[in-house]
Amino acid sequence: MAIKTAFAPVLTVPNGITDIDFYKNAFGATTNFCLTNDDGSIHVAELLIDGALFHVHEETQQSTMVSPAKYGASTVTIGLFVDDVQAMFNRAAAAGATVMTPVTDYEYGYRQGDLKDPFGHKWTIQCRIPVSSDWKP
């Protein structure tokens, strides 16, 4: 059986049980499944945003993965393509995300805005729009 290639980011958060609620409130994420460790921490939660899959792990003493908030920086940006950028952007901000760059239309054919979630992960909420006739790559 052929498998369609997909990209599934893995995000690490300080407190999985409560932090997953941010993704539900901000982006309408749903939980596909959630596995816990013996101490009650989250080993992995598989979440979906309108069918787009991602995983959340909780920081633990045994893990080498940490939330970007621990160092005040992130090495990646999660690009989330949606139909209504402004509505999703506003929803995420209302749920506790920090606005980094407001939603802007760019001449190269993107409407996008940048947010930082409460755990330090950077999100670009975006969609394609017509390229400006003045734009030259």
Feature roles, as predicted:
Residues 119:
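C-terminal catalytic core of tyrosine-transesterase DNA break-rejoin enzymes
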Residues 1-11, 20-116, 126-137:
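Vicinal oxygen chelate
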